Amino acid sequence: MLMRWHHPLRQAIGHAVGVTPIVCKNTDFLSVCEYKRGMGALDRYLDEQLSRGRAYFSRNDGSLALGLGLEAFSAAATRLIVKRRLANPRRGFFLILRPEDQIIGAPDPVRWIDPLMKYLQIDYRISLLRAAAFHGSTHQAAMVFQVIAPRQLRDFNIGRHRIQFVYQGPTAFAEINQPDWLGQIKSAAGFARVAGIELTMLDAARYFRKAAGIHGVAQIVKDLGAKASPRKLAEAAEHYENTSVRRLGYLLDQANHVRQASALEPFARQAKSMKPLSPSLGQVPDSLTVLHDKDTKWKLIINEPLETEF
């Protein structure tokens, strides 16, 4: 689809800076405009993207807009990365840095995680500590931005941000990542997909090592448990390991979130053996289980006392 550049103000600006957008077209990723080459054309392309509310673009779209080969475009982009005008979180994907972004090296990831994952063609959800903070767990200072995805991706740092990808098997992910169990985080750049309260707690119980350990999970459950729908919690729990569900049920009980805990009791009745509350301390030998309290309702060995005050 082609769209001629007729707006007189933009034409005037384009001629004044020595680069004229000559045609716009829609691509699968975003709308791009072709420019006549000229000194600083990439800089002006970035300004135009920002004026249209887009703080990101792909290498292919940028090179197409400027009429440059990929090698020439990459060289120009590298110069702007050095000048801290651009950031490059993934090969072929660029972030445009506004002056306020340059201080910390990149915008808040919630502004660009959705277009990045669309560029990579991978479904996702923001979860764990960042999702808990979004839903109101004020104790969660989300120093890391955690994303659950059905493919194994490398973590990376960009500016002061740490992006951590948590792998979930494709089958389980497809069953869990359903609209009824997800929410949206709105930012100036659009929307990003986030785990709902129920998934946030289940993910924290499942990936507890990445949620500040069992004590971090306990704090999340204390803060968010009352807001969870018992129905959604029980439905989503069908797709998680039984031990993780029992761990969450126990913590809900400790926090006196009775309705939510009751929704998970059927999972405890299915359990065949006792499991440690905190597997990070290792399996508890049978000879040492007498040293720990046991919760027979949830079939858990309480091998780590909780520090959270419920």
Spans of model-derived segments:
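Hydrophobic/aromatic-lined pockets within catalytic cores
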Residues: 67, 81, 136, 140, ...
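Short acidic (Asp/Glu) patches
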Residues: 110-115, 132, 147-149, 178-186
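Hydrophobic alpha-helical interaction segments
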Residues: 26, 181-310
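Short beta-edge/loop segments at beta->alpha junctions of small alpha/beta modules
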Residues: 33, 38-123, 229-231, 235-239
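Exposed, interaction-prone assembly regions rather than primary DNA-binding/catalytic cores
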Residues: 124-177
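Pocket-edge structural micro-motifs
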Residues: 98, 149, 167, 196, ...
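Short, intrinsically disordered or compositionally biased N-terminal tails of bacterial proteins
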Residues: 1-38
